Swiss-Prot record:
Protein name, entry field: Dermonecrotic toxin SdSicTox-betaIIB1bxiii
GO cellular component labels: extracellular region
Function (record text): Dermonecrotic toxins cleave the phosphodiester linkage between the phosphate and headgroup of certain phospholipids (sphingolipid and lysolipid substrates), forming an alcohol (often choline) and a cyclic phosphate. This toxin acts on sphingomyelin (SM). It may also act on ceramide phosphoethanolamine (CPE), lysophosphatidylcholine (LPC) and lysophosphatidylethanolamine (LPE), but not on lysophosphatidylserine (LPS), and lysophosphatidylglycerol (LPG). It acts by transphosphatidylation, releasing exclusively cyclic phosphate products as second products.
Organism listed in the record: Sicarius cf. damarensis (strain GJB-2008) (Six-eyed sand spider)
Cofactor binding mode and count: Binds 1 Mg(2+) ion per subunit.
Superkingdom in the source lineage: Eukaryota
CDD domains attached to this UniProt entry: GDPD_like_SMaseD_PLD
Subcellular location, record wording: Secreted
GO BP term (any one): lipid catabolic process
Active-site residues annotated for this sequence: 5, 41 (nucleophile)
Signal sequence bounds: none
E.C. no: 4.6.1.-
Cofactor: Mg(2+)
Amino acid sequence: WIMGHMVNAIEQVDEFLNLGANAIEFDIDFDKDGIAQITHHGIPCDCGRKCTKKAIFTEYLDNIRQVTTPDDPKLREQLVLLALDLKLQRISSAKAYRAGEDVAKKLLDHYWQRGNSRARAYILLNIPLVEDYEFIRAFKDTLKNEGYESYNDKVGINFTGNEDLDKIRDVLEILGIHKQVWQADGITSCFARGTERLKEALEKRDTPGYSYINKVYAWTLVRKSIMRRSLRLGVDGVMSNNPDRVIKVLKEKEFADKFRLATYNDNPWEKFRG
């Protein structure tokens, strides 16, 4: 999975897909009451990027629904995963539950259209810190209460704050989540980051019977040398400002026979058995 990073304006979707991404990450900004308003990162952000691009969240969902719906004129078949980077750290933890309700309802109304949409992308909920786990509870409660619990099959969980992996596991246990879990490891492209935690996540992913990590990705990679390092370690995905660079690295002799781009037929919740 090549995840285009910070794809917050509607016109950027095609831009990143044209560069080779098969997944996109966009930032969800909330008001003080936990209501999702816009797709927007804000300052500061990655080096060399404009941080201020934005869209109305519901309008963004309306567009991305078309881009991921078979037979729609806007369909881009390669786009199979949507990562929602939830900016919960900007609001009170007491509002995390309300935020989860709101995002679930907006996805129901504007993406899935309560069963009337054929939009097919998988959804990854990126939670910044384990203290905001009530967002996940609320999201699942809302799908159940609204009568659309089946959409849980399309939704995965990912904690992005580089916290202790055992602490993350404990929170997942509290929530009763034992599947459909990704684990991110990374830092803004402005800085270097070691591989200790990334290696630990990969080791847990590959441990037989360990159900709290199905996929691991590294972010935000812009240098080919770091992309190569991550691929050698065996990541499932890379988040990048430059998907075209990832494509070029994947075509190199060292990687061409070991990796390929994920398609809709690849289940993002299953561990890869090479």
